[in-house]
Amino acid sequence: GGLHFIGLDTMVPGRPHGELDDAQLDWLAATLAHCTGQPVMIFMHHPPLTSGMAAMDACGLLRGRERLAELVRAHGGVQLIAAGYMHRGIVGALGGAPVVVAPSCSHQLALDLRPQGGLAVQMEPPQVGLYRWTPQDGLACHFSHVQAYPGPFPV
């Protein structure tokens, strides 16, 4: 057993927010049981964390976060929960596992941490999240711009 990849569908047709329903969480519990004692990465669109960006949190993962945290904690081998949706690079945790929200490969959203903050596009450079995991070293996450820039220049 090497590293196991698990994808979860958080999309709700016709709605901006995400959910994890009981059927999907039951499936995840059974899948994690097959991976007992083995490293796992979970991938999903809506991140299972509160970012502090009020407008995005209001339409984020609105159902299933608590049970997901319980399943992740019980398994103990989840190396990463990777997500997107927020159009910003964000790092947090859930159930003892790191949550990494990749930045957007198009536009970013303005960082607005006011309690009643709104949504605004910020024309920051597009980026991607790259994940590297080895049994010896564990996880490293890199955010990389996808546009060409001068360099590299030796230091």
Question: What is the predicted role of each segment?
Answer:
Residues 71, 92-155:
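Binuclear metal-dependent phosphoesterase catalytic core
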Residues 17-98, 127-130, 139:
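His/acidic metal-ligating clusters that form di-metal
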Residues 1-2, 124:
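Short Pro/Gly-enriched coil loops immediately N-terminal to beta-strands
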Residues 10-11, 52-56, 111-114:
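Short acidic, glycine/proline-rich loop/turn micro-motifs
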Residues 14-22, 114-121:
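Acidic/histidine-rich helix-loop elements
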Residues 12-14, 48-50, 108:
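Feature marks short, surface-exposed loop/turn motifs that line or immediately flank catalytic pockets
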Residues 2-12, 41-43, 97-103, 141-144:
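Active-site-proximal beta-strand elements of phosphoester/diester hydrolases
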Residues 5-21, 69-76, 146-154:
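Charged, low-complexity, helix/coiled-coil-prone segments
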